[in-house]
Regions:
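Bacterial Sec-dependent N-terminal signal peptides
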Residues: 1-33, 441
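Long, intrinsically disordered, low-complexity segments
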Residues: 23-27, 56, 68, 80-85, ...
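An aromatic- and glycine-enriched ligand-binding surface/loop that stacks and positions planar moieties
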Residues: 25-88, 165, 190, 196-204, ...
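Conserved, well-structured interaction surfaces
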Residues: 49-63, 84-162, 184-188, 197-210, ...
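Flexible, polar/acidic helix-loop-strand segments at domain edges
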Residues: 347-421, 427
Length: 581
């Protein structure tokens, strides 16, 4: 594959880059790279830690986060092309659903680079433990669990995007190794990832020292692995297991929260209380006169108690910044960025349509969407650090909402969240609904289904309630959502409202399509984008193959074992082959 030399080169440079920040010895500048990797570099625990740090640094790159955004969000109904998008051909074609194999967003080399870094650590770390007596067996196991999880996360992104992908757990260290691997089936890769994570979950760090402020949410923990397993089991359609792992995360977060409350003692305020038994952050102030507290904690300051795993960008202009968010969602110079809110979402509340949000009192509309005019709406989430919704105004509309300044163009410090608590709670809700029988004709069947629906509904209601700034009732009405199809749509709609612009929506729609065995639901919701790309979607996305992405043309040329997704051409002429379903 084309990524062969890139993987090896990047892995080696990753070692060098990690050492640069750690003041490694000067021999790195004069020895051949292969000798560094195979001989002199891997001697003590610090060497291993440096390479692990390099894995996280690679994940922070603009190319990686850009693809997390594009693959998980840009084909969905949430977004359309923004400022000057017509000058960015590849991005523009995504929004027009005119994707071909030459589109730069189909490249995956940065993800495979991270995978190989992880495989390299797994290859060399045991020998380091033999040399360094201070590198204990438990620390070695924790390292292996950490990089295994990072590797599995990268593969999870790849299979959700491309479906079948080349899969290996072998480190590539020289050009003589075989790289032209055929694609492994989605189901086989998913099973391997689950097996791997379950084998290492208990070895991962549960709690980092409190002195390491950002480690608990900026590095892999047991909670992060359990969140990954909950989601993977959703895709596997093993819903009981998805619930089991989601509960592990929810229970762990609840214990952490209770421990924090115990430390606070009498200083506990209204805003510190759980919502319906869940340790989620209250969005309103203690008096209820303003809202935006949860948004600022989760997306502004970041590293919140709801976070499970996020890519952390330090609030320091001398450190790396989140260039992907700055470019795509916007900054102090250009807002909206090259991606903006879909028109039907932007007008949903102002025009009182409520196809997406349940009412104008859902604070997530005001926190996610910023109106620049009656026809132009920017993505506020991640681009801005805080939102203040003033409930003392006579009426809740745009003049009751104020926004802090956007991040500076070259200094966006917004963390990119991969897993947070409400995401996992909604995974559980989805799994509970899917556990219900499709045949509830008997009284026993109806009762069993009703129990599952009510459990799922309670989760959704708690999440919805925290974002409801109405002075009246904040409760959803269960009587409107007590069938399986109604509950399925409620879960997916709540995931859209809660996780909007976080790189989740397209994957949610693909997962729904895999479960349904067709793309009817996906096409129906994505077509809501209308003239901004939706009208051409019905025919292009009518076949299941088309909801994935094509392999990049360069990969096909150099790896003869890769067979192109049948929905896509070579990329040199058309985007889609003119074939039937």
């Amino acid at each position: 594959m084309k990524l062969k030399k890139n993987i090896i080169k990047s892995a080696l440079i990753g070692l060098l880059g990690a050492c640069t920040f750690s003041s490694c010895s000067d021999f790195l500048e004069i020895e051949p790279l292969e000798l560094i990797v195979l001989d002199k570099f891997w001697n003590e625990e610090a060497d291993v830690e440096n390479v692990v740090a390099g894995c996280y640094s690679a994940m922070q790159s603009q190319n990686v986060i850009d693809r997390m955004m594009a693959w998980g969000e840009f084909r969905s109904d949430n977004v359309v092309g923004g400022t000057n998008v017509e000058n960015q051909k590849d991005l523009y074609n995504i929004f027009k659903e005119n994707i071909n194999a030459s589109n730069s967003f189909t490249t995956w080399v940065d993800f495979y680079n991270i995978i190989n870094r992880c495989n390299t650590v797994l290859h060399f770390a045991p020998s380091v433990a033999e040399k360094d007596p201070n590198y204990t067996e438990s620390e070695l196991r924790a390292t292996k669990a950490e990089v295994s999880a990072l590797r599995d996360l990268m593969y999870f992104y790849l299979i959700r995007t491309f479906r079948d992908v080349p899969y290996t757990t072998v480190a590539y260290l020289d050009d003589n190794q075989t790289m032209d691997l055929p694609a492994t089936k989605f189901e086989d890769v998913l099973d391997s990832l689950i097996l791997d994570l379950e084998s290492v979950q208990n070895d991962a760090v549960k709690k980092y020292p409190v002195t390491k402020e950002y480690y608990q949410r900026g590095r892999i923990t047991q909670d992060a692995i359990h969140a990954m397993l909950a989601e993977m089991y959703l895709w596997k359609q093993d819903y009981a297991s998805a619930v089991r792992y989601a509960d592990m995360v929810i229970d762990a977060k609840t214990v952490d929260y209770q421990n924090e409350l115990d430390k606070m003692g009498s200083r506990v305020s209204v805003t510190d209380r759980m919502i319906d038994g869940y340790p989620i952050i209250t969005d309103g102030s203690a008096t209820g006169s303003t809202y935006g507290n949860a948004f600022e904690a989760i997306f502004g300051r970041g590293n919140s108690r709801e976070s499970i795993f996020e890519l952390i960008f330090m609030n320091n202009n001398n450190m790396p910044s989140n260039g992907a968010v700055s470019s795509r969602y916007g900054n102090d110079r250009t807002f909206p960025g090259s991606v903006k809110v879909a028109d039907f979402i932007g007008t949903d509340v102002p025009d009182e349509v409520y196809d997406v949000f349940l009412s104008k009192y859902d604070t997530r509309y005001w926190e996610n969407v910023q109106a620049l005019s009656k026809t132009l709406y920017g993505i506020n989430k991640y681009a801005y650090q805080s939102v203040l919704i003033d409930m003392t105004k006579a009426e809740l509309k745009s003049d009751a909402v104020s926004y802090a300044s956007a991040y500076a163009q070259d200094y966006c410090h917004a963390n990119w969240i991969i897993y947070r608590l409400t995401d996992v709670m909604l995974m559980k809700a989805e799994a509970l609904v899917e556990m219900a029988s499709n045949n509830d004709s008997t009284d026993v069947g109806k009762q069993q289904n009703d129990t599952l629906y009510k459990q799922a509904f309670a989760i959704i209601n708690a999440i919805s309630k925290r974002s409801n700034c109405s002075t009246g009732s904040k409760e959803l009405d269960y009587s409107k959502f007590n069938t399986k199809s109604q509950m399925q749509e409620l879960v997916l709609a709540e995931r859209q409202r809660e996780l909007m612009f976080e790189g989740k929506r397209w994957y949610d729609l693909v997962r729904r399509s895999r479960r349904d065995g067709n793309t009817n639901f996906l096409v129906g919701v994505v077509s809501r984008k209308g003239s901004s790309g939706g009208t051409a979607i019905s025919s292009k996305l009518s076949r299941m193959d088309a909801i994935y992405w094509p392999y990049n043309n360069d990969e096909i040329k150099v790896n003869k074992n890769l067979v192109q997704n049948p929905a896509f051409s070579s990329g040199e002429n058309d985007s889609y082959e003119r074939t039937g379903k």
